[in-house]
Regions:
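Gly/Pro-rich active-site capping loops and adjacent beta-alpha segments
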Residues: 165, 319, 330-333, 337-346
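Core structural elements
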Residues: 183-190, 203-225
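Short, surface-exposed loop/turn segments at secondary-structure junctions
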Residues: 197-204, 227-235
Length: 346
């Protein structure tokens, strides 16, 4: 049994199965079946706490399970078509299912026990900054970091409430400065970190992926009087996220310009990398500006314009720069009222 730091937080892992795998039906409901067993044990009087006997007696409790779906599968769901699972080694058809039956099973199991999650393979790879070096097949345990196999990402998060001024507006200058300082610090950490395998270490230095994110979004929205589930809340969150990501890429390009040059993986991926930055810029224009302060919206657009121009001229030092981690542990050490991007939990 592995317990992180000797405490009750168990080591995490992500388990992913492609939606065309022959075992996908069993995989979809494996955790929900174990959840029902735990309920029965709790009803029989066993301890149902996180570290209690009930959940300690059932399987699959130390992993996050996700089904990897493609646009082809999602189209089959929408059009109510059949879906074939295929042999991994020969690609021969193994079984045929109604796509919507698989979809409903995924939804029911996720509703019952939280798993499986979904990873949208086609979308993930369409936003891949380094596709010429390999495709993205998987993620880290919490699914915020997706990149090449055998790679690693050091994470950092900012408490958004600390950047609100007396009128609950975002202090844009301070936020951008924090992004710049943190990206530089994370870039330095890449060379000082220890890696579990030689291959992970090599890729981390070739591509230098970083994971800057934020926490306390739910509290930020409450302080502004914005419902979490609202167009206004989503637009405001999108603008902040866009500003953070755009400024992080822009500063990564400044580091490449002023210090050490782009990462080694840049040369082979320059065109698709710049294409992803341009996609981000176009998405920024789609944020509903009616719900976002003008200066925040303009700052986000300017950061993306800067990242594209600097990237074209000098390259980018880091193949990825932002993630949105759940911050389930560090969020409370950071004086957050809510964790990650989540609302206040009842």
């Amino acid at each position: 049994v592995i317990k992180s730091g000797g405490k009750t937080r168990r080591a995490a892992k992500m388990v992913i199965l492609n939606v065309d795998h022959p075992d996908v039906v069993d995989f979809i409901d494996c955790k929900s079946k174990e959840e029902k067993k735990a309920w029965a044990l709790i009803d029989a009087g066993y301890d149902g706490s996180f570290t209690g006997e009930a959940y300690g007696s059932v399987f699959f409790q130390n992993s996050n399970n996700s089904v990897r779906v493609t646009d082809e599968f999602m189209d089959a769901v929408v059009r109510d078509r059949v879906w074939h699972t295929r042999s991994v080694t020969t690609s021969a058809i193994a079984e045929t299912h109604r796509a919507r039956d698989l979809w409903h099973s995924i939804a029911e199991s996720a509703w019952l026990c939280g798993d499986p999650g979904l990873q949208y393979d086609t979308t993930v790879n369409s936003w891949h900054t380094s596709p010429n070096s390999g495709r993205i097949n998987a993620s880290n345990p919490c699914s915020e970091y997706m990149f090449l196999d055998d790679s690693a990402c050091n994470l950092a998060s900012l408490n958004l409430r600390k950047f609100q001024d007396a009128t609950n507006e975002l202090d844009i200058a301070s936020f951008k400065a924090a992004v710049q300082v943190t990206i530089l610090a994370q870039e330095i950490v890449v060379d000082f970190a220890k890696y579990p395998t030689e291959r992970i270490g090599a890729n981390s230095h070739l591509f230098r992926p970083l994971g800057l994110g934020y926490a306390n979004l739910g509290a930020l929205l409450m302080a502004r009087g914005l419902p979490y589930d609202s167009d206004a809340g989503r637009a405001y969150a999108a603008a902040i996220t866009s500003l953070m990501c755009g400024e992080a890429y822009a500063h990564s390009a400044r580091i490449a310009r002023d210090s050490t040059g782009p990462c080694e993986g840049w040369a082979a991926n320059r065109d698709p990398f710049l294409g992803v930055l341009e996609k981000h810029r176009r998405q920024c224009d789609l944020i509903d500006a009616a719900y976002v302060p003008y200066n925040l919206m303009q700052a986000a657009k300017q950061s993306w314009d800067d990242s594209i121009k600097l990237g074209r001229d000098h390259g980018i030092r880091n193949s990825q720069v932002t993630v949105l981690a759940p911050t389930g542990t560090i969020g409370f050490m950071m004086d957050c009222d809510t964790t990650g991007v989540e609302p206040d939990i009842a």
